[in-house]
Amino acid sequence: MPNRALLPSALTQQCRGYPLLDELLTIASNGVRVHLRKPIPRQTRFLRNHPSGLARLNLLSKNTRKEQYFLRCLVADADIIRIWSEIVIIPFVVVDKGDGDHQFTCRTIPDLSFSEDGSVNHCTDSTSVPKASFEHCSRIAREIVRCKQENPECEIEVMAGDVASAYRNAFIYSECVHLFGDHIPEGEATIIEHSAAFGWSGSARIYGVFGGTVDFRHDHNIDPEHPSGFFIYHWVDDHVN
């Protein structure tokens, strides 16, 4: 199920010359395909969520409603499993999120590595996922040193940002969404993820394709003070300018 907001024609024009343009256009046109190297064993029962999911059920439900609002997931009655038995249910884990108030914010992560021998991550064919490479973070240090040498009287500042929500636009191919199911038994709800989940072993590479696109476009913008372009560094869903 591709994200209709990603326009292949516009991406082709704006990102001409981007090394991973073909991979980007495939995601925009078809969505993210998940190829398995072996079938995932059929589940005979719902997997229990991590105890953190029960302890912070209100936040788990809040995050799920937010994802549903932005069309990043489908929330259905738990009984749907009876007619769509191939859904793979993934346990939820709830962890603290940065410096936010832990009573009101959290990060929900599907444990796609459970169980050890029959998980989505274990069965994913990693060779089918687009290749993406990341530069060592020492590049940031070198840029800071360069700026300081050229402007010794100035204080060098770094601007960092997390664009995770933008990467959630990488939607899963419709015939693969059944691999990304979640369950909230207390709410009698089954959740089907639409976007490439953060816990999936292929997500970092998919986000690398998207992050590289941001870098490519940013690097090709110039102004009189930056005739050679702007410094930008990305690592998965984090960007540094």
Regions found by a protein language model. Name each.
Residues 1-77:
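Low-complexity, highly charged intrinsically disordered N-terminal segments
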Residues 44-50, 190-201, 234-241:
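Glycine- and acidic
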Residues 19-30, 109, 166-179, 211-223:
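Phosphate-binding glycine-rich loops and adjacent basic patches that engage nucleotide phosphates
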Residues 6, 79, 100, 222-226:
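Structured alpha-helical bundle/scaffold domains in large eukaryotic membrane-trafficking regulators
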Residues 55, 59, 64, 68-208:
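Catalytic-core region of right-hand nucleic acid polymerases
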Residues 9, 49, 66, 156, ...:
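Hydrophobic transmembrane signal anchors and adjacent membrane-proximal interface regions, especially
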Residues 204-241:
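Active-site palm subdomain of RNA-directed nucleic acid polymerases
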Residues 20-44, 112-123, 180-186, 229-230:
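Short, compositionally biased low-complexity segments
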